[in-house]
Swiss-Prot record:
Belongs to the frataxin family. One of its GO terms (biological process) is iron-sulfur cluster assembly. InterPro entries: CyaY, Frataxin/CyaY, Frataxin/CyaY_sf, Frataxin_CS. The gene is cyaY. Keywords: Iron, Metal-binding. This is Iron-sulfur cluster assembly protein CyaY. One of its GO terms (cellular component) is cytosol. The lineage of its organism: Bacteria, Pseudomonadati, Pseudomonadota, Gammaproteobacteria, Pasteurellales. GO terms for molecular function: ferric iron binding; ferrous iron binding.
Length: 102
């Protein structure tokens, strides 16, 4: 994946997140500032997702912890084999919102 493809892929990820949160009537606010996408929950806690262009990685930070994902086999996967979408669902649940992305 080159840098252009990386940015296009991340934009698709962020769009899917927003679409699913809205479609499932989640009480959250989404915001994008530069390379950072944040989801703010009712209690003001956040899930932060940012793109790391030099590494071509997607990072996720939440109450659950921090994870680094690489795009492999058409999926964002962490070094220990965790799926990005499953980790995001777990993170949202830890912040009080049940949402499904798959």
């Amino acid at each position: 994946m080159n840098v252009t493809e990386f940015h296009q892929n991340i934009e698709q990820v962020w769009a899917k997140i927003e679409e699913q949160l809205e479609a499932q009537d989640c009480d959250v606010d989404c915001d994008t500032q530069g390379s950072v996408f944040s989801i703010t929950f009712q209690d003001r806690s956040q899930v932060v997702i940012n793109k790391q262009e030099p590494l071509l990685e997607l990072w996720l930070a939440s109450r659950v912890g921090g994870f680094h994902f690489r795009y492999q086999n058409n999926n964002w996967t962490s070094n220990d084999g965790k799926d990005f979408w499953a980790c995001l669902e777990e993170a949202c649940a830890a912040h009080g919102e049940i949402v499904h992305f798959s």
